[in-house]
């Protein structure tokens, strides 16, 4: 399934809640504060937003500049930020970014338990699913 992503940098906002927001029923299903990582400069507030599968799919053939502009508006609304405070944005779209029907188990293993297959496609559509899959493989190997 497609995924459209916006990175946006704003003038620093002291009063804003910088927690990650996850809402699968929203047009922006995932919003994360990206400036809070160690070693990041604090002269801007950088945010990363991913649109929902439905929102992205509806705009697959739309001009990317228009999709970026629409995401900018959605992000500013979600964060209660003034669009005039946006210093920079970058947009990217992946046509095949998210697994629609995950496998439902953390990994596959051959009969000899010498070959393991894992990844986000096993459990879900996000990097967290890949991490959980890999962790499950490691635990299985360590139990042997």
Predicted regions and their residues:
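Active-site substrate-recognition segment that forms the wall
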Residues: 7-59, 66, 70-79
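Short active-site-adjacent structural elements
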Residues: 57-58, 97-100, 124-126
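Flavin (FAD/FMN) cofactor-binding core of flavoprotein oxidoreductases
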Residues: 69-113
């Amino acid at each position: 399934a497609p995924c459209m992503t916006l990175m946006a940098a704003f003038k620093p906002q002291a009063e804003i809640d910088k927690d990650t927001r996850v809402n699968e029923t929203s047009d922006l299903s995932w919003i994360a504060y990206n400036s809070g990582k160690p070693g990041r400069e604090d002269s801007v507030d950088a945010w990363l937003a991913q649109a929902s599968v439905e929102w992205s799919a509806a705009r697959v053939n739309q001009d990317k500049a228009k999709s970026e502009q629409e995401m900018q508006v959605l992000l500013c609304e979600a964060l209660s930020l003034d669009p005039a405070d946006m210093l920079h944005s970058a947009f990217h779209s992946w046509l095949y970014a998210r697994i629609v029907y995950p496998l439902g188990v953390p990994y596959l293993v051959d009969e000899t338990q010498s070959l393991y297959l894992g990844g986000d496609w096993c459990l879900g559509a996000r990097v967290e699913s890949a991490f959980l899959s890999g962790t499950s493989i490691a635990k299985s190997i360590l139990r042997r």
